[in-house]
Amino acid sequence: MRQSRSTTGLASVFALLVGCASGPRPAPPASGPVTLTADEVRTLVASADARCQLLVSRQERDAGHADAVRAHQAAPRDRSAGLTLASCAQLRADFETDEARVLAITEQGAEAARLASSGPADAEAAYLQAVNLGQYVQAKGLVAIGRLSELVSLLKTASAKPEIDQGGPLRVLGLLYVRAPAWPVGPGDLDAGLDLLKQAAAKYPEHALNHLFYAQALIEADDHAAARRELDQARALCTAERFGDWAARWKKEADELAAKLR
């Protein structure tokens, strides 16, 4: 049985969490023809699934991403290979600081998820396409603001299965509504964001980002007392045993927000 795919919930889309690379990393291999047997593809996908997890080293995650790239290049229409590459790509990109690498990795990840989709109602593929597209948009900046509507559409599709990534579709769409510019420039809607993030924190209380993102929305709504409570919960959940390398950066963000509320 394959392990569940881990995602970080599009944190980098809104620059809430700043990547801290330990040094230059090679860009993902360029797309090209790769000939592998079906068994070899399955072996690579299994290896990538095992390595692209929150609780492994960055070196292992990068190696898993490389495995996923090879599998997808050999079988670009294979659903498992495509979804695995999309998952590995957004995890790898979240710790990259070089814009060109982020763009290459996430563009490839989003396209892999799109090709893997079984149709317009495929929530898992939509979510993985969204988290990669979100990181791509963040790296591109204002020139990519026109793609926010595409992000909203993908996340609405993903929300049919809110349990993905422990409330991932709810918290990512909620944060997008909170952070994006409002109509007519963008899809921003604080009330809608608050509602989605409240649901995420209530239904999936074990994920730190649900509380951290809800606190962000509550601060925007000037409900500082409730925001402090959510930040306390987020910080308590931010342990390396739960979230690996991401725990320290999420806790730092929560600490900084809490300090501003004093």
Regions found by a protein language model. Name each.
Residues 21-94:
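N-terminal leader/linker segments that initiate helical-solenoid repeat arrays
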Residues 48, 53-55, 91-100, 135-144, ...:
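Short coil/turn linking the two alpha-helices of tandem helical-hairpin repeats
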Residues 55-69, 99-111, 144-152, 185-194:
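Helix-turn-helix repeat elements of alpha-solenoid scaffolds
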Residues 76, 120-121, 163-164, 205:
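Short coil turns that delineate tetratricopeptide repeat
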Residues 152, 225-240:
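TPR/TPR-like (Sel1-like) alpha-helical repeat modules
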Residues 236-262:
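Terminal, low-structured helical/coil segments at or just beyond the last alpha-helical repeat
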